[in-house]
Amino acid sequence: MAKYDEKKQLKCSFCGKTQEQVKRLIAGPGVYICDECIDLCSEIIADEFQETVDFDPKSVPKPNEIKEYLDSYVIGQERAKKSLAVAVYNHYKRINTNKEDIDVELSKSNILLLGPTGSGKTLLAQTLARFLNVPFAIADATTLTEAGYVGEDVENILLKLIQNADYDVEKAERGIIYIDEIDKIARKSENPSITRDVSGEGVQQALLKILEGTVASVPPQGGRKHPHQEFIQINTSNILFICGGAFDGVDKIIENRTRKSSMGFGAQIQAKHEKDVGSLLKEIMPADLLKFGLIPEFVGRLPILVTLESLDKEALIQILTKPKNALVKQYKKLFELDDVKLEFDEKSLIAIAEEAISRQTGARGLRAIIEDIMNEIMYEIPSDNRITNVIITEEAIKEKKQPRIERVEEGKIRPTLVKARTKKDIESA
């Protein structure tokens, strides 16, 4: 009997649960571990291993695999996703090939994304980096100035990438840098300026070397260089640079060029506004970028031109509901954590999309529109435990009325929606 009591009191050395409270208890020299703690340890190790797995250039995902992943997060832009998938595949294939002793050296191909505000340029670059599991950094071209002037040096872009790679320079040298608002560093006129343009042409000149591939000296703490500090040496030859911008006004340059080429006898007569901006951007040529204000050397280092289209109403509705990180899914989850069910009726989604189009903000403006409606109700829910359902209606969007709210009877509280879930439940959600 004493032996039975002793066995009954055996406990897990990690969580303290007794043998009766768990399925299995495994003994070691003076210690015990239960099946639940083993499962938990396995999950922790698996998660950490997943986070630390480095990208192997030898196992580059195929273009269709890259596009399939982009489809999960980015709605529409089929042409842009295919172009990006092929460009990224070729870039990392080049890294692997150039390591070997071959007769042909493959040149670097950076990417220029052109598209209206809110069309998904930044999201495409972020999603690519996440899929490839490579370090990623975003820089704003408007903050950059030529060396010696107030503002950020171009080397600070590389520092962000090194920091995101946990100062592993070798890992950073296979990363992706996205430079946003690149159209804002266009020079003020097509002709070279006599006066110094430190935030336009000067920045383009400063970016040339790192875009092409060079060993750059980066100050580890950022800021300006001075002769008494040590530098981090990083080779930019294998860093993929993706530059993006709205390029407002370049459509008129394209339109003027195409109109001139179609003049003369037998030319087809087109309505003045027959083509939208997205259709015109598809016809862009390097010469149009030169007229816009980019210098020839800069355009030459961005040989792959990828254009994005303006998002129409149907695309915006899909963006609200379809992707894994869709805004509607995010807000439903936030409400569920407070045991409240959130619904959007079909007309409300149409109204949100129409409002985003009228604001000319594209997908970027969707969150701001929803947040305006949600703010008041999200303030009330935590302190009103009778609210069970919230329905967002068309009137809530267009007329700024309060969403339709359903409550339980006086004296009762709402039932719990959130239940304890296993890791399997979370993964399948």
Curated annotation (Swiss-Prot):
Annotated ClpX-type ZB domain residues: 1-53
Gene Ontology biological process terms from the UniProt entry: cell division; proteolysis involved in protein catabolic process
SUPFAM superfamilies hit by this protein: Glucocorticoid receptor-like (DNA-binding domain), P-loop containing nucleoside triphosphate hydrolases
Record flagged with keyword Hydrolase: no
S-S bonds: none
Binding residue positions for Zn(2+): C12, C15, C34, C37
InterPro entries cross-referenced by the UniProt entry: AAA+_ATPase, ATP-dep_Clp_protease_ClpX, ATPase_AAA_core, Clp_ATPase_C, Clp_protease_ATP-bd_su_ClpX, ClpX_bact, P-loop_NTPase, Znf_CppX_C4
Domain of life: Bacteria
Cellular component, GO, one term: HslUV protease complex
Key words, A-Z: ATP-binding, Chaperone, Metal-binding, Nucleotide-binding, Zinc
Residues the record lists as binding ATP: P116, T117, G118, S119, G120, K121, T122, L123
GO molecular-function term, one example from the UniProt record: unfolded protein binding
Database matches in SMART domains: AAA, ClpB_D2-small, zf-C4_ClpX
Complex formation: Component of the ClpX-ClpP complex. Forms a hexameric ring that, in the presence of ATP, binds to fourteen ClpP subunits assembled into a disk-like structure with a central cavity, resembling the structure of eukaryotic proteasomes.
Family: Belongs to the ClpX chaperone family.
Purpose: ATP-dependent specificity component of the Clp protease. It directs the protease to specific substrates. Can perform chaperone functions in the absence of ClpP.
HAMAP family, per database record: ClpX
Protein name: ATP-dependent Clp protease ATP-binding subunit ClpX
Record organism: Clostridium beijerinckii (strain ATCC 51743 / NCIMB 8052) (Clostridium acetobutylicum)
Gene name per UniProt: clpX
